[in-house]
Structure formats: structure tokens, C-alpha cells
Curated annotation (Swiss-Prot):
Site for Important in orienting the L-aspartate substrate, residues: 112
Protein task: Catalyzes the oxidation of L-aspartate to iminoaspartate, the first step in the de novo biosynthesis of NAD(+). Can use either oxygen or fumarate as electron acceptors, which allows the enzyme to be functional under aerobic and anaerobic conditions.
Molecular function terms from GO: L-aspartate oxidase activity; nucleotide binding; steroid dehydrogenase activity, acting on the CH-CH group of donors
Highest taxon listed in the record's lineage: Bacteria
Induction: Expression is repressed in the presence of nicotinic acid.
Name listed for the protein in its UniProt record: L-aspartate oxidase
Keywords: Cytoplasm, FAD, Flavoprotein, Nucleotide-binding, Oxidoreductase, Pyridine nucleotide biosynthesis
Disulphide bond pairs: none
Pfam families per record: FAD_binding_2, Succ_DH_flav_C
Length: 531
């Protein structure tokens, strides 16, 4: 029997979790745009959330996830992932993954925004993502191919099925890589905005490639802005993990006033969307916002990554304060997938931030993303292993009649427009203005043979921006990370409804899998928003 071939686009935690789950008999190729360590996962300062403590439970973790997600989560997916995630964390512990431990040898469990218990597993203080990638790279078998400096240029579709991927290397050479199954694990689209936490290679490629191939994209209006990026003189230097607030740090203005004290019952540990809006409001008044970490005695030991970021930015760590501002962090929406990571295109999977499974709802709970990456990576691999080998009689060769529409703008112009019109606060006239601008940009059609990687990335970002803006315009309510100043409350009429895009058009669809609890929608969500 011929070997089953798998092509994986991306090299973050989801991609490597998937690759590590295949036995040596599978022909797995991991393709990444730059170095294998160019991914958002490497930058993850938070940890992995799992209900491990004796007084904690999966039910409590589920409730926190639903509360943060503002009643837009797929309940079955949440329950599944949290159950499997706890077992995966247990497996990491048994295999000696270097989670932080106390002087007695017990695992240190941290607390982050919107969690009701200490359940965050960290490694290396604030270097969990980097250490997880190192660990997964050691776990994958030697027969797996890791191809660096090669970019996915198009998905190969034959008779409605994905049968491989066309790639372009750093020298501009095109290649065709046929596969029984293709897995998109290329991250989100943080580079659409001026201030973001993403690797520079994360430009919406997976979203746009899936859309071009005919797959469904869902929930693109739900873009999470992390409350605390270190921003100095308009320059963003990196993320300041909310674990700092979990350890006793607090948000203050230049006069030392605690800005979250009366804004939410959880104070500085309110859900990310809430904290981002409060900081945005303070900055709009002309107030500077800081994290005061003076109460954390061992800050440099506990947060070595953040300490290095402060040094790079010229921040005196002994001042006990870090200047912060919100920035784009995570896309809750993405390519529509089922519990196995299958998209609506046969032969095509999506996992990690590229995918939208319904786990995060309208706003992701802190440290649920690495959990998602580990669970869906392993789960997608297990599903692929169970499938029969595709009867391969490939007819698609090197197709050179593929064209990209490339807008005649610079990337920073698109970032500036998205930041001013589509970030934390949104309203109809501004969204319409942005949508018109996006759809009337002059562009050129560039053949895939001639296109540069940068042009390809700009095209992906432009396509994603158009769909994202249309979603934000259509959803006339505020829910989670999507906040409309002209519709400042969650609406029961939007409960369970999703905005779905395909090449054939856009539709609003009721998803019966979304947790339907009207009291949660009408009371808890609205109480957590401010107008």
C-alpha cells in the first residue's frame, strides 16, 4: 500500500503537534515561509490552561470559556477540547516538559484574565511558547520533512477536492507538492494592524488560500486586541503578558489611579476585550496607561522575556511601570472546521488560529490558544490516520495561469486604515468608508510566476480585510471583541448567528451548535460591556 502523504502549511504549535502525532509510515512535509521558528507560538508568553488543581474542574474552565466568549461558543467543541486538553497537559507532565515548579517540586499554576482559578501552566516564566516549540521539534520523527523559506502560493483543487499545494521558494521558483491531505496551520492576520503581537510572516495566508479554494470563512469580525503591548513613542516592542496582572500587577494612569478598579467585577483580570476598551477610552482622554508591577518582587526572574523587551525599549525596569496600549493579538474567526479540523473542502484541514471551530466564541479566554493548538493538531492527525488513502491519479501539474489581485498601495497604508476604522471601537459610517476604500483600490493582476512574496502577502491581507470589514458592518450588535458604538449591546436576535463567507457570496446563518442561553446573552454579556 502506498504511503499517505500530508502537506502542512505553517510551523507553529498546531502544525508541529499534528506532525508529531504521525507514525514514521506517513510522508509528512511541513512547509514554512521563513525559519521553522517564525510563528506566533514562539512569542506566546502566556501558558496552557487546564483544570488541574484539586479545587478546579473542567466545568469551571468551561464556564469561564463561555463567559469570555460571550455566548458565541460551540458548546460541544468547548467541552471536547477542555477534556482532551487536560489529558494532553497530563501527558506533557509525564514526558518531562519543563513546566515551572515551586521549591517543593509542585507545578506552579498561574492565573490570567477571566479565569476563576489558578490553572495556567507556564514554562520558562514567560517563555512557554518558545519552549513548547522546542519540545515539539524534538518529538517529530526524523522522516518528517521540514522545508523552510517556501511559501504556499495556491491550493490545488481537482474535482472539488484539495490534492496539494503550489509553493514558491525564496528564489521565486514554483513547485507542486501533491498530497492526500493538506493542513493549513498558518496563523491569523495580525499584520493587518499597526500595533500587533504577531510574527511578521503572519499575513492571513491560510485564510485567503482557503477562501480562494472555495472553503467557508466564519466569524471574521471577532478580532481580539490584547490590552497590553509595550508601546513607547508610537513604537510597539512586544507583548506584556496578562500573567503580570495575575501575579499582582495593575493598570494605572500617570497619576497612579487604578483604571480597572470600578470598571468590572474582575478588575485588572477582566476579559481582554473589556480591558482593551477601558485602556482605549483612557488614551482617548489623553491619559497614558501603565502596568504597575511594583508589587512583584521577583519580576526579572519570573518574566525574563518581558524584562528583555523592556531593556530593548529603554524602559527602566526598576521604575516598576511599563507603558502599554492595546494591539491586535488573535483572530477568533477563521476557516470553518468541524471537531476534526476538516474544512468544507474535501482533503483540506485547518487548525490553530487559521481555523474557526467555535472554541473561542466572540472573545478568546487567556491561554486557551496553545491548548487549542495541541488538541486540534493531534486530533486532526488521528482523523487523517483513520481515513483511507485517497485514490491518487493526479492530473494537476504546475498551473501557471493562476493570478493574484495585488492592490497598488503599501502595506503600512492598509495597516493605518484598518487601525483607524476596524480596531477596538467600530461604527457604521467609519466601516462603510473603509469598505468603499478597500473595494475601490486600484490593483494589478499578477501571474503567480512573476509575483513576489511581499505582493502575495499584501494580496492576502487585502482580501482578508475586505471580508473582515464586511462582517463587522453586517453584525449590528456588540459581542465580545466586536464592539459597535452605534449598537453597544449584545442582541438576542444575533444569538447563535454567524456571518459566513465563500467565493459564492456572504450569508448569515444560524448555528445550532452555539450555546443558546438567552439569560447569559441578555444579562451577563450586556453587564460586561460598557457604553
Amino acid at each position: 500500500m502506498s504511503k499517505k502523504t500530508i502537506a502542512v502549511i505553517g510551523s507553529g504549535a498546531a502544525a508541529l503537534s499534528l506532525a508529531a502525532a504521525f507514525p514514521p509510515s506517513y510522508e509528512v512535509t511541513v512547509i514554512t515561509k521563513k525559519s521553522v521558528k517564525n510563528s506566533n507560538s514562539v512569542y506566546a508568553q502566556g501558558g496552557i490552561a487546564a483544570a488541574y488543581a484539586k479545587d478546579d474542574s473542567i466545568e469551571a474552565h468551561l464556564e469561564d470559556t463561555l463567559y469570555a466568549g460571550c455566548g458565541h461558543n460551540n458548546l460541544a467543541i468547548v467541552a471536547d477540547v477542555l477534556h482532551d486538553g487536560k489529558m494532553m497537559v497530563q501527558s506533557l507532565l509525564e514526558r518531562g516538559f519543563p513546566f515551572d515548579r515551586n521549591e517543593r517540586g509542585g507545578v506552579c499554576l498561574g492565573r490570567e484574565g477571566a479565569h476563576s482559578y489558578n490553572r495556567i501552566f507556564h514554562a520558562g516564566g514567560d517563555a512557554t511558547g518558545r519552549l513548547l516549540i522546542d519540545y515539539l521539534l524534538k518529538r517529530i520523527n526524523s522522516k518528517i520533512k521540514l522545508i523552510e523559506n517556501e511559501t504556499a502560493a495556491d491550493l490545488l483543487i481537482e474535482d472539488g477536492r484539495c490534492i496539494g499545494v503550489m509553493t514558491k521558494d525564496s528564489k521565486g521558483r514554483l513547485k507542486v507538492r501533491h498530497a492526500d491531505e493538506v493542513v493549513l496551520a498558518a496563523g491569523g492576520c495580525g499584520n493587518l494592524f499597526l500595533h500587533h503581537t504577531n510574527d511578521l510572516t503572519v499575513t492571513g495566508d491560510g485564510l485567503s488560500l482557503a477562501y480562494r479554494a472555495g472553503a467557508e470563512l466564519t466569524d471574521l469580525e471577532f478580532t481580539q486586541f490584547h490590552p497590553t503591548l509595550l508601546v513607547k513613542n508610537g513604537v510597539s516592542y512586544g507583548l506584556v503578558s496578562e500573567a503580570v496582572r495575575g501575579e499582582g500587577g495593575c493598570l494605572v494612569d500617570e497619576n497612579g489611579r487604578r483604571i480597572m478598579a470600578e470598571r468590572h467585577p474582575l478588575g485588572d483580570l477582566a476579559p481582554r476585550d473589556i480591558v482593551s476598551r477601558v485602556i482605549h477610552e483612557e488614551m482617548a482622554k489623553g491619559n497614558r496607561v501603565y502596568i504597575d508591577f511594583s508589587a512583584i518582587s521577583d519580576f526579572e526572574t519570573r518574566f525574563p522575556t518581558i524584562t528583555a523587551i523592556c531593556e530593548k525599549a529603554g524602559i527602566d525596569i526598576h521604575s516598576g511601570k511599563i507603558p502599554v496600549a492595546p494591539g491586535m493579538h488573535f483572530l477568533m474567526g477563521g476557516v470553518s472546521v468541524n471537531r476534526w479540523g476538516e474544512t468544507t473542502v474535501p482533503g483540506l484541514y485547518a487548525i490553530g488560529e487559521t481555523a474557526c471551530s467555535g472554541l473561542h466564541g466572540a472573545n478568546r479566554l487567556a491561554s486557551n490558544s496553545l491548548l487549542e493548538a495541541l488538541v486540534f493538531g493531534k486530533r486532526a492527525a488521528e482523523h487523517i490516520i483513520q481515513k483511507p488513502v485517497y485514490n491518487r491519479q493526479y492530473q494537476s501539474g504546475l498551473e501557471t495561469s493562476v493570478f493574484y489581485e495585488v492592490p497598488d498601495i503599501e502595506g503600512h497604508e492598509l495597516q493605518s486604515k484598518m487601525t483607524s476604522h476596524m480596531s477596538i471601537l467600530r461604527e457604521q459610517s467609519s466601516l462603510i468608508e473603509l469598505s468603499i476604500w478597500l473595494h475601490t483600490l486600484p490593483f494589478q493582476e499578477v501571474n503567480v510566476k512573476d509575483i513576489t512574496i511581499r505582493q502575495m502577502e499584501l494580496s492576502h491581507l487585502w482580501q482578508t480585510a475586505k471580508l473582515m470589514t464586511f462582517s463587522a458592518l453586517l453584525r449590528e450588535e456588540s459581542r465580545g471583541a466586536h464592539f459597535r458604538t452605534d449598537f453597544p449591546h449584545a442582541e438576542v436576535s444575533w444569538q447563535g448567528r454567524q456571518i459566513v463567507h465563500t467565493k459564492k457570496g456572504t450569508k448569515i446563518r444560524k448555528n445550532e451548535g452555539i450555546w443558546n442561553n438567552e439569560s447569559f446573552t441578555a444579562e451577563k454579556i450586556t453587564e460586561s460591556l460598557f457604553s
